[in-house]
């Protein structure tokens, strides 16, 4: 059993790796559950203070043995939106106070809002927001840059 507290991350991709590195850097205990053995080995090398567990993060027994009900936050960062949402809801049911699923499909954001989850990570929306902020800065100095980008992206920025 993993000690209580800390953050649990489901999935060991780039976002999870970067988040774990940032959390470990400020002294937060991090545990990552990842299916892929090669990814687990890489994570263990790059994140020596993190606890890396190989297994299926949708397995309730595994999550219980990893102490999900005792963690401060649960972040679901797999490549599957449906899996992220279901496991985030499971973590919420276990009593985790802060639960955040990653949603790649923006169409799912309306569904997430119906679940009672506090937060969601939507990489496409984050990138669009960053681009929009950058273009607003250009538009104020160059005039029409914002209109051009808005047209190119089909109005997806705002």
Regions found by a protein language model. Give the residues of each.
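Alpha-helix C-terminal capping segments
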Residues: 90-94
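Rossmann-like NAD(P)-binding element
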Residues: 71-83
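Cytosolic regulatory domains of K+ homeostasis systems
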Residues: 1-45, 49-50, 61-73, 98, ...
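Short glycine/serine/threonine-rich phosphate/pyrophosphate-binding segments
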Residues: 16-19, 81-87
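Glycine-rich, N-terminal phosphate-binding loop of Rossmann-like dinucleotide-binding domains
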Residues: 77-78, 103, 124
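Conserved acidic residues
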Residues: 56
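Conserved Rossmann-like nucleotide-binding pocket used by diverse enzymes
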Residues: 53
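Short loop-to-helix capping motifs
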Residues: 59, 80-81, 105
């Amino acid at each position: 059993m993993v000690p209580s507290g800390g953050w649990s991350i489901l999935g060991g991709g780039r976002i999870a790796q970067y988040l774990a590195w940032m959390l470990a850097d400020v002294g937060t205990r991090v545990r990552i559950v990842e299916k892929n053995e090669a990814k687990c080995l890489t994570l263990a090398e790059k994140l020596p203070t993190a606890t890396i567990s190989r297994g299926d993060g949708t397995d309730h027994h595994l999550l219980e043995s990893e102490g999900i009900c005792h963690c401060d936050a649960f972040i679901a960062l797999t490549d599957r939106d449906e899996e992220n949402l279901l496991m985030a809801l499971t973590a919420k049911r276990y009593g985790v106070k802060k639960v955040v699923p990653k949603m790649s499909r923006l169409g799912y954001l309306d569904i997430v809002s119906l679940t009672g989850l506090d937060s969601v990570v939507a990489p496409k929306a984050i990138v669009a927001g960053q681009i929009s902020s950058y273009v607003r800065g250009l538009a104020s100095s160059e005039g029409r840059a914002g209109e051009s980008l808005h047209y190119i992206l089909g109005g997806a920025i705002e």
